[in-house]
Amino acid sequence: MDIFSQRDYYPIPSDDVIKYKHMVHKKWNKNEVIQADIPSIIVHLSSPVDSVDYKGFSDFFLFYRNFLTPAELYDYLILRFKWCMREIESYQHQRSGDNQLRIGKVALIRTFVLLRHGILNHFADDFLLNENLRLRLISFFNEDIKSDMKVIVSCLISLKKAWLHAMKLNWDNVLFNEPAFSAYTDWIDYKIKDVSQLDMAQKRNSRFSYHGIQSISNPDMRNRSILSIYKSDNFDHMVQSNSNKISRNRTPSTLLFQKDSSNSEMATVYSNRKGAQKKTIALPNILTSELDRKDVMSNVTRMSHIIQDAKTLRSSDVNKIIPSTPAKKVELILNTIYSPDCLESENIQESLNQDTSSTQKSFPKGIMSLLARWKKNHKIADPKIRKPVGFTNKREAELDNFVKYVISISSLTNKEEDLKRLNENLDSKFDILSARTIDEVEYLFRLESKLLAQLSTMQKTTRTLSNDEFNDVNVPNNIDSKQISAMDNLDLFRTVNGVARSVISLTNSVNKLNNLSDHSVLDRRRVKSSMPNFYNRERSLSGLSNYAGLQFYDASSEMSAEDDKPQKLVFHDGVDELKNHLTQTFTKPGSISNSSPLKKVLPNLFEHPSVDSLASGDACSYVTYDSQLSQMGTVKKSMKDETSRYSNYEGPVLKKKVAYDNLREFTFEDSKEIIKNDTSSLIDILNSPVTPDLSILPQTPTGKGSVQHKKKEKSESIISPASGRISIAKSHHMSLSPNLTKLKEDDEYVKGDNSLGQAEDELIRLEKNLRDSKLENYNTVVAGNLGAGSGSSTPLGDSPTNVFELPSSINMVESDMDTESFESSFEQRQPTNLREQYFKSIGSPETASPRKVNSNNAYSQVSSQMSPSLANKYLFSPDNESLDIASPVKNVEDLKSRFLKGNNQSASSSQIGASINTSVTATPKNNDMFGSDFDKNGLKNIMTASEEKLSKDPVELAMMKLEGTFKKNKSGNNTGYSSDLEKEVDILNIANLPEMNANPSDKRKSLMLDRRRQTMFNIGPSIYPSNTNDEGYDEESITDDKIWSLIAQYHIDDENLLAKNHANHVPFILMYESKDVAQQFTLIEREILSEIDWKDLLDIKLLYKGPNLTSWLQLLIQNQEFTGIDLAVARFNLTVDWAISEIVLTTDLKMRRNTIERFIHVAEHCRKLQNFNTMMQIILALNSVVVQKFTEAWRLIEPGDMLLWEDLRKIPALDWNYHALRTMMKTVDPLKGCIPFIVVYLSDLTINSEKNTWIVEKRVVNYSKFSTCVQIVKNFIQKVQWSSFYDIIPIQELLSKCIYISSLSQDEIEHLTAEFAR
């Protein structure tokens, strides 16, 4: 605080700490700061001696963040304010201190003005998101005031009021309980609280206000707020309109005039140029002006409503070509080329001498030389000099050449005939660049639709999802029957970025489903209580268009909301009906298969005679049925009629369950309650004529330990308990068979039950050894099946076999870990515990060797062709004789007596709900499948496998833990690969469940039955962390690089869109008037430049360093990450490339001439509209080397257009640092609107930014650098704000075409240019 009392700073800064540059203006005379240290700047701004420089400290609050933090600045201001208070209190009672007292008071008031200015005009930048700084200011306001000086108290009260005003302006629904505005004494004692300090009652429902959000997110509003604090004298001087009436009502001096407040409203009435109508224009006002609706934290694009509401580019067709209208008419009348000598005079001779000397100058070669000579020949001389009409001289040859090469050629071409010819050939032509834009947009939506369909199918295959879950991931149920329309009623500006992010998110989801981890495998067992709708896919799937026997009915449409929850199972069927109607298999003559070895595990198996009418390539479908959700028995009459050819086959079916709350209670009812007419749907499915293709199955080796199989004549139907879901898979190696034969029960198989029972005892004895054994290559097999370690699995979309189409045969298994029907293909004794079943199901080394005899396991046939996500759907399957030991309602023995009927009995009625397996299998006549030829040597090798290898198997570890036999090694280390499996075992507490039997087989039968049900219906606890972004957006994983790479993957598939098809290209601008095109580009440029924030300009950084953009879609994708400057520069370059591309692609000579002329006219109209940005884009394109090479087209251009082009091409000349262009922009009429040429300002800012910030590091600031920068920024945003005076009506179709532009790549341009040169 004492620093302000030092000699260098009191009362004003000395020359030792601050340096000035004397500035003289017609209205003021002041010293401008060049360099200074921080305290001297504060003293200078609150100087008690100099006049108030409101512009100076307004500029300071714009650029101070380049060398000071807001906290540091306000600390200096608070210190200055307290120093002034001390000065006033020290000298208020001293007679000799009048001067010091006056200095203190003036400095106090000016410091107060600085603080109030920062609070009112920069609250959003400094305080809105900075709680610490807010608390620091509040602490200063709440300090006790001991002074009785009114000036001090008044300043502090005014600061409190300004602070509360700013707080209320930026927050809604906040109560500060401040005193009445006029309660002077109450304000002295009032203590301000921050929003974070208020009680809940005071800030309930509080939020950022619309004004607050816009103040930190809307560049256009921020720019207008900044301009509103300046007078018009602070800007470039502007030429006023010639209309006195307009000048009186609204002059440039009133455009941005506002003295001290940035938030007051000012509207001015002015009349248009005809004076017939008055308009009211609201000047920059952050409270009343129409603003964009957007959230500062959202990813919504920042573009304004003009571009956002533009219709989507729908067509690239060019229906007609409008004739070119010259922007400037030139009439040349040559009456004669003879000049009589008598008319010569001295004055004429002097004129001739001057002209002759000037014509002797060397002109450049080419078209421009001809034009320059023509202009010189027709230059208007001094009007006092009279020239005869027929006068001629040495310029005669030049004039003849002009007539020959310009006027004659132009007059020889009949434009009406040319135009008629061009319009006749438009049927097969279109704008290739517009078509590319449409194709690029549709590429995103095609990719999203493909991923949605793929993800939907994968989810249906890997787990059952409810309708709500499909809605969560935005997967439409009818995605196959009706594809997403990419272009119908679509606002690309609002959605294209979201589509790109959706595609990336969906890609991540598909990859997750393609590459299943251990976590995913376990998660698949947590089945959801719902079934997706498949009927929408029925008609469109390949290979089954003429097949009416396989129909699916959407039962969920008739289920009430009460049914969509865990329900009580009610099974309806009889034993005999099940045996007679649900066990049908079809075999190929001579094919061999074994009946299931799991006699004890999967009881009540039936064998039937085989069918002899099968052919190679027959089909087998696989369906699992969710008895909880489906209503297979109640099919509509229309559905029944479609499958009437199977209606004569009657049998029991699964009925919809009655809605109860507990799934662990089972009710068994008599089959007489079944309604016969409700059986059509299931019977249609079960009667499907299906056959297997045995050629795809692995062969069983012959030799020791194996027995040659005989001709297969028996088949089986496996029944296993599970929940059941309907899932469909199709293997393309199968085809439908027209044959249908009902199989009978194989009584011989039942006789083999005793032998299987004996085999079970031997397996129990070997169980412990099998647990501790493993071959070395087993880990590789497991990793491949889990999808975790193999990189060879292809994405489903690229797979040659689409396993998600409608199946060719049906395999209905009700299993919570469904599809675990293990059937063997060789006559050796098979293991019956779960682990050995798992080894067989995934192709363990024992069964992975080549086999001589084919296996007819329908599941293995399907899963062998499926992706890992489907083939490894579940790894465990409980035994049919498992006991529900954890059931809280039913006694285990009671369930056993009611649920299991015995080994030699037909399947019970309960097993209808438990399992239906109509697989394509076969059984040999020899029922003694497990003989004495068991390969004990092979088993010994397995037994000797090291435990170290076994410990790496997550499934083995989990199963050992389940059975209570797991022991950690000495090191205590366990692989993280199996952590999820172990967690599930621990949390479910399965290992500690009471054992009903000491028999290992009984313990194995009870494995996870009740706990599995709890997991399946989400009754038990969840062991996995919730991941709400599994199928949704994972914002952290969706980076700009991923979005850009997504667009980079786009390539043109349609040959019609390639550059080699240039003969069919017609630029769309030929369809419209040049003035309309110029106006629409003006609207676009206005919106883009309004996205440039003043803060970005002050700290200019061109962030974009990527490849050149060739389409507006690429700009849209990266728009959210672009600064306003990057967006404007990218659009500028894209427009230049687009104009060049349109000309290069046009091969017809006269059409190219028309295109060049149209661009010249558009540029001229842009100049009249004071749209200097678009004007420069077109001029740079026409003046490029590529376009200038088309000399034949330039020769055909109208003389008036050539004169106009000569004037235009001089504008971007670099002479005197864009002197011509700067002069044009300084002399604009603001009421007409203005689009400044941004490159000029960026060039000035870039050069200025190269200056040093510090003269003396961290001590003396290069103040002039920042004051210059602020002047450039203010002048730029001022001109951008003038664009609000444009009164242009958007033409939606043309506006869309002008927005969504594309260009050729540089390689394509070079290739076409080289081709045309030949």
UniProtKB/Swiss-Prot annotation:
User: InterPro entries recorded for this chain?
Assistant: Ras-like_GEF (IPR008937), Ras-like_Gua-exchang_fac_N (IPR000651), Ras_G-nucl-exch_fac_CS (IPR019804), Ras_GEF_dom_sf (IPR023578), RASGEF_cat_dom (IPR001895), RASGEF_cat_dom_sf (IPR036964)
Gene Ontology, cellular component aspect? cellular bud; cytoplasm; plasma membrane
Q: Where is it mostly found?
A: cytoplasm
Keywords, A to Z, come to:
Cell cycle, Cell division, Cytoplasm, Guanine-nucleotide releasing factor, Mitosis
Domain annotation N-terminal Ras-GEF: ranges = 29-164
**Residue span(s) of domain Ras-GEF:** 1073-1314
Q: Where does it reside?
A: Cytoplasm; Bud
**PANTHER family from the entry?**
GUANINE NUCLEOTIDE EXCHANGE FACTOR, PROTEIN SON OF SEVENLESS
What is the protein named? Guanine nucleotide exchange factor LTE1
Taxon lineage: Eukaryota, Fungi, Dikarya, Ascomycota, Saccharomycotina
